[in-house]
Amino acid sequence: MNSSSSHRNILVTSALPYANGPIHLGHVLEGIQTDIWVRFQKAIGNECYFFCADDTHGTPVMLAARKEGITPEQLIERVGQEHYRDLTSFGIEYDHYDSTHSKANQEISKDIYLKLKSKGHISRRSIEQSYCETDKMFLPDRFIKGTCPNCKSKDQYGDNCEVCGATYSPKDLIDSHCSLCGTSPVVKNSDHIFFKLGDFHKKDEKSTSLETINPSHLKTDFDLQSWIETSGVVSESEGVKKKLKEWFDAGLQDWDISRDGPYFGFEIPDETNKYFYVWLDAPIGYMASSKNFFEKNFPNEPNKFDSFWKNKNSEIVHFIGKDILYFHTLFWPAMLEGSDYRAPSKVHVHGFIGVNGEKMSKSRGTFIKAETFVKYLDPEHLRFYLASKLGPGMDDIDLSFEDFINKVNSDLVGNLINSVSRVSTTILDALDRTLGVVSKEGLALIEEILYQTVKFGPGEDSIQNIIKYAYDQRNYAKVLREITRLGDRVNRYVNDNAPWKLIKENPEKAREVVTVTLNASRFLAIYLYPVVPKISEQIYKLLNLQDSPSFKDLDKNRILENIKVLPYEMISKRVDEKAIKVMLEENKQSEHSKKVETSENPVPEERLEISIDDLSKVELRVGQIVEAGPVDGADKLVNVKVDLGELGIKNVFAGIKVAYQPENLKGLKVVVVANLKPRKMKFGISEAMLLASGEGESLSLFIPHKDAKPGDRLK
């Protein structure tokens, strides 16, 4: 089980933040999870490099720059600096942070494309697209708006309805218009270029006429499904494997890798006004970031890049969110293997982060930017808290601020830091801030921290190996449970020996207790280093140690004795609940100000007046949600069962998932349109409608009085 038994060469990446918005806690979660793993690998002596970059191409970046009156290059330069500042403020330590708009990325993208093309994995065909004659550009689906052809909701996107969850083609949208200028688009044909993903799945192999095939082409020994099932690349998560099996069973489709100009990105070789789709060159940004780093830092090792990207004895490890699983487990490995590179060794998939039991919400102040968090709270505290919640799966994580306060104040400040602070101030001052020697009793405690045998699964192992294994498996919650338990043991030793009494009665005995406590705390700081590096380094600084904490120092032969200890400086304060409240309130006010700015000149809607007779036809009743769950294939919908008293239980598909998680809805009383004609949807029958106000993350369900009963009619 010992993860450090052999030397490893590892290249690690986290997903690239997109360059049209600020860094928020979702980005920070992934950065911290990855950084902890990288720091651990380095701390046990492995060769490990951590790369990332800003994802800079695509229509949204081009339009954001146009809106600001600057060039895309100017926009991504500024945003890239902001992203790097915000991510590194949480102690995320990249070996290199780059931009996908780089010469290296363009060269590698071109190389991969031309190799895929030479091997017959590229095709082209004409497709119909919406085109804005005013803006002189083909419109992506998200830049077309209109009325949903299914439920007739207005102001819906060109590819799916956020109200009913229907998916459709932009040409099916009613009264469609360009979201930039408001004019109706026309349909034009355009040749697009496709990557033949099915070439890398044996199930999808099809016969091809002899006239169109070169026998040396369309041949690949790499089968995606076999790779997924046998390599262990995503083996730890049943949810991941289930989703991949669904995609394989449905068959892998050709992937459109081109976009028509105007477009901010790299032009496709040998094409006119055609650009690589952002998702082609974005993951190649991992390669370009590493290439730029290796060329600068290893000038005498020209094969350093190939030693990772073409050598399967090295490891390539990606950390990603579950929303980009398709790209990283299907397109990306196929592109690499089809162009003479190698597929990743591991793709670690994590869930999303919510705040106080709900999705991050701008209206509630819980859509928290990294910059705002750092303004009010200690980033090390978030690292500790997230680590305490992170396991090897892809479950979503909830940042409950009440739990955050309790866990940080109790387990970190009140336990692990407390053992240091309680012996490092007045007691050590009275001892001329000089350590003594470790007593026999103290040595037993230190050996317990370093070598004790602990049950693990069906067997047992040393505490060091268990912590190392848990780190390597990304089971950070297990790591912190073990370290906190050891911290309890150290504090119990301090309580039992009461050095604040000994300093008056037996100063040399007090010196022994302080020496044991600080040595034990130093070893805990090593264990903790990947999670809270700054706190661990502060403990090292206190002990006058110049090096960074390293797992090689987890050895009783490295006990510190008879050394001078520096004056104590505050290591970390407790979390202030008031700071959290101020932060959330500032977020709310900021969002409110934005809404006021954008609504200074609202377009008046035509109001439709109805008679009292019309209103009487609508039967509004109190309902109580008795069951709620997600809807497969519809990210915006929640399927709820609503108890309407004498009317029984009705099934409803509600477009509320942007603001409410299904697991938080059970038992909630709501207001329901109870006599709505049942509507057949592709997911099932929806028999009623929940009343709500607001849009997007500001959406709020109408909640009746607490004494209202299911079935009560509103009058």
Swiss-Prot record:
Its cofactor is Zn(2+). Pfam families: Anticodon_3 (PF19303), tRNA-synt_1g (PF09334), tRNA_bind (PF01588). A motif ('KMSKS' region) lies at residues 359-363. ATP binds at residue 362. GO terms for cellular component: cytosol. Keywords: Aminoacyl-tRNA synthetase, ATP-binding, Cytoplasm, Ligase, Metal-binding, Nucleotide-binding, Protein biosynthesis, RNA-binding, tRNA-binding, Zinc. CDD domains: Anticodon_Ia_Met, MetRS_core, tRNA_bind_EcMetRS_like. Zn(2+) binds at residues 148, 151, 161, 164. Binds 1 zinc ion per subunit. GO terms for molecular function: ATP binding; metal ion binding; methionine-tRNA ligase activity; tRNA binding. It is found in: Cytoplasm. SUPFAM superfamilies: Anticodon-binding domain of a subclass of class I aminoacyl-tRNA synthetases, Methionyl-tRNA synthetase (MetRS), Zn-domain, Nucleic acid-binding proteins, Nucleotidylyl transferase. One of its GO terms (biological process) is methionyl-tRNA aminoacylation. Its EC number is 6.1.1.10. Residues 614-715 form the tRNA-binding domain. A motif ('HIGH' region) lies at residues 17-27. Gene3D superfamilies: HUPs (3.40.50.620), Isoleucyl-tRNA Synthetase, Domain 1 (1.10.730.10), Methionyl-tRNA synthetase, Zn-domain (2.20.28.20), Nucleic acid-binding proteins (2.40.50.140). The keyword Calcium does not apply. It is an enzyme of class 6 (ligase). It catalyses: tRNA(Met) + L-methionine + ATP = L-methionyl-tRNA(Met) + AMP + diphosphate. Belongs to the class-I aminoacyl-tRNA synthetase family. MetG type 1 subfamily. Is required not only for elongation of protein synthesis but also for the initiation of all mRNA translation through initiator tRNA(fMet) aminoacylation. Homodimer. HAMAP family: Met_tRNA_synth_type1. This is Methionine--tRNA ligase. It comes from Leptospira interrogans serogroup Icterohaemorrhagiae serovar copenhageni (strain Fiocruz L1-130). The lineage of its organism: Bacteria, Pseudomonadati, Spirochaetota, Spirochaetia, Leptospirales. The gene is metG.
